[in-house]
A protein has these predicted regions:
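Histidine/acidic-residue-rich, glycine-tolerant segments that coordinate divalent metal ions
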Residues: 51-52, 71-73, 79-89, 96, ...
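Acidic/His- and Gly-rich active-site-bordering loop/insert found
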Residues: 1-90, 95, 99, 103-115
């Protein structure tokens, strides 16, 4: 079987069995098994999910990183390898990232004796929940690493092409939560209440001025309001 065929099969297996952030136990076992079969060394970091492998010898170390978690989304695609886990799917392509990194590991293993140093391969959990990188850092996975490289699939590019540039490329993410307290009233007598819906709607619009007025126009920033809901009544 060719490397391409192997990676396609692995990607489809991962796609069929997606796991949410910090729940990627079966995914980790699959990756571990595939790496063991290729005689790739796995480093003994204490991680609940995710793993770190290493190829090569020497003092110099660089790292390659891929994310492995999925999203809480129901898959609607009608393909033979669609998700078998209700309400969970690899909607962001982390099955692709993991397969690509496995392919890199296999190719690097074939050239291990010619490498001028070590390549540390990070399979990061919990990218979607914004905490997985910290678990690797706290475990010591980046000790002595001089540089780290990652990638993300880009459906807008033609197959077989990749893009890069100097400077920042992909973003760091921060979350914010706002709570707006109002006072209920009859729809025909809004003056007797405090309309939280109106205020929230205005706030969403005003927040967009942060990107256009508070940030240097030469810097890249995106501010999105992803969800608006009312408190559940007990």
């Amino acid at each position: 079987m060719t490397l391409s065929s192997t990676l396609i099969n692995w990607r489809r297996e991962l796609h069929q069995h997606p796991e949410l952030s910090l729940q990627e136990e079966a995914t980790t076992r699959r990756i571990q098994g595939w790496l063991h079969a290729a005689d790739v060394d796995i480093l003994p970091f204490e991680l609940k999910t995710g793993l770190v492998a290493e190829i090569g010898k020497g003092e110099d170390v660089i790292a390659l990183r891929a994310d492995i978690d999925a999203l809480p989304i129901e898959e609607s695609a009608d393909v033979p390898f669609r998700s078998l886990t209700p309400g969970v799917m690899h909607a962001c392509g982390h099955d692709v990232h993991t397969s690509v990194m496995l392919g890199a590991a296999l190719l690097l293993k074939q050239q291990e004796t010619t490498l001028p140093g070590r390549v540390r391969i990070l399979f990061q959990p919990a990218e979607e929940s914004f905490g997985g990188a910290k678990t690797l850092i706290r475990a010591g996975a980046l000790q002595n690493v001089a540089a780290i490289f990652g990638m993300h699939n880009e459906p807008g590019l033609p197959v077989g092409e990749f893009a890069t540039r100097g400077g920042a490329f992909y973003a760091n993410v921060d979350r914010f939560v706002l709570r707006i307290n109002g006072k209920g009233a009859h729809a025909a007598r809004p003056h007797e209440g405090k309309d939280a819906i109106l205020l929230a709607s205005q706030l969403v619009t005003v927040l967009q001025s942060v990107a256009s007025r508070d940030v240097n126009t030469l810097d890249s920033v995106v501010l999105s309001v992803d969800r608006k809901s009312t408190r559940l009544n007990s």
